[in-house]
Amino acid sequence: MKNIIAFILLLFSVSLSAQIKSPEEFLGYPIGTKFTYHHQIVAYSRYLATQSNGLAQWQVYGYTSEGREQGQMVIANLPIGVSLEQVQQNHQKRILGEKTDPSLPVIINLSFNVHGNEAAGSEAALNTLYALISKPNKSIPYVILIDPCINPDGRDAYVTQYNRRNYIAGGNADPNDQEHFEGITSGRYNHFSFDLNRDWVWQTQKETQQRLKFYRSWMPMMHADFHEQS
């Protein structure tokens, strides 16, 4: 009986992978050949959620100062009969030192692109989302929260100028090329020229306030924040 169930799950996994479009298939270009605008990131995230057969949910947690959507993908492989709400409630009790169910899953948070001009982060997030949803690991329970772009306004400011100036697929390594000069407005910051990576404690910016409200509703055991290195 176990072998039959394992075989059915394998068939389901292969079928799911075959049906879901990769970032390249959805966007029309290979990841890394150009930068993706934030609305395209949201569109692909929503697409993945609809194709995940209940594995993933795209949850909107706010909007930026320029009106761009802020959201996180919640990818959850849960025991039969267990809901996301139960996992959240169980973990909140654990934080307070109350008795909890030790069998419920680990909660992991991955965030990308807090500095908008470190734009490779969101491209990596798209590939990460695709890998986790198209070929899910069903052997262990887990909840993975993925924020593909913490700073949508800064990202689009950078991506717009980069895509206008970049004439070579994959970029020009010459440091004197105009693609390496952002101009007056740096995509590192948000709409109000504030570095969101310096706002975790003070929470002066709209984007931070909304994100941390979502974060506190989960209080993940692990948080990895992805940056570039020059």
Model-derived segments and their meaning:
Residues 38-80:
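A non-catalytic alpha/beta surface segment that caps or lines the substrate-entry region
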Residues 35, 81-84, 118-119, 156:
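Short, solvent-exposed loop/turn elements at domain surfaces
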Residues 115:
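Conserved phosphate/anionic-ligand binding catalytic regions in large, soluble enzymes, centered on
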Residues 74-103:
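Carboxylate-rich, divalent-cation-coordinating active-site regions
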Residues 19-33, 110:
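Acidic/histidine-rich, surface-exposed loop or edge segments in extracytoplasmic proteins
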Residues 96-111, 119-230:
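Active-site/substrate-binding loop(s) of hydrolase catalytic cores
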Residues 1-4:
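Positively charged n-region of N-terminal signal peptides that target proteins for export
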Residues 13-17:
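N-terminal signal peptide c-region/cleavage motif recognized by signal peptidases
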